[in-house]
Amino acid sequence: MKDLLWKDFRENRTVLTAIGLLLLIPYGISIVIAVVDLYRGYTTSWAELLLSGSTIALFLSAGVTSFIAGNAIAGERANRSAEFAAYLPIPRQSAVTSKAIVAISSCLFILLVNFGINRLAAWVQSDRSHDVPVQDLAFFGLPAVVLMFGVAWLFSSFSRSPVIAAASGLVAFLVLIGPSTFSMSHATGRISDSWLYWYCSTSLIAGIGGFVVGVVHYLRRVEP
């Protein structure tokens, strides 16, 4: 299993590196703003800049889970390494378990690091006007992450294109969040709560269901 995990990590190394560089951009912009303000003689709270940068990075972290899941299986087919792996005595159960562990652990690491930085900056920052409540992150962010990951994983198990698989997760989120946000913004009381519960439950069911179906399809697939 250790060799499988290392193999799958190498398969996803390019994508993870690109994602890491992408998530550094908001923090880099915050540093540039701090340097410019310091040069101009302005006093800017580093916690405020870090909070802004980490909030953007946290939202980006949710989106990139779709790319990680989309590349988990389809990426191996795209570079033809799946054909080589098919001739090795590797049980498909072990192969899909390794891919799932690498993909899920990568997503959790990215999300937890940015979430931790965001909460640290919010704790230091005295002005909470720009703070994103934890309950909002839980009710909107967690179902979105599960939805995008599960749908992208499902398409990755069928597709040879990691781009198409990754895009499917983002499209699923946009299709679901559009009507949900519109309905919740024009509803009040119990109706608004009903739409929120519908969004959460639908996202979780679709995401978990997509992941399970993707695993089953991979196990039953004859081709690599």
Predicted regions and their residues:
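Short helix-to-coil transition segments within interhelical loops
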Residues: A86-R92
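Transmembrane helix boundary and interhelical loop/hinge segments in multi-pass membrane proteins
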Residues: S66-A86
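Junction motif at the cytosolic side of a transmembrane helix
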Residues: L4-L5, A206-P224
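Extracellular/periplasmic helix-loop-helix junctions in multi-pass membrane proteins
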Residues: T181-C200
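Interfacial transmembrane-helix starts/ends
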Residues: L5, F9, R13, R92-I104
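Central hydrophobic cores of alpha-helical transmembrane segments
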Residues: L21-L24, W153, V163-L176
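Secretory targeting signals
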Residues: Y27-G70, T97-A166
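Aromatic- and glycine-rich beta-strand/loop motifs that create alpha-glucan
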Residues: M1-L23
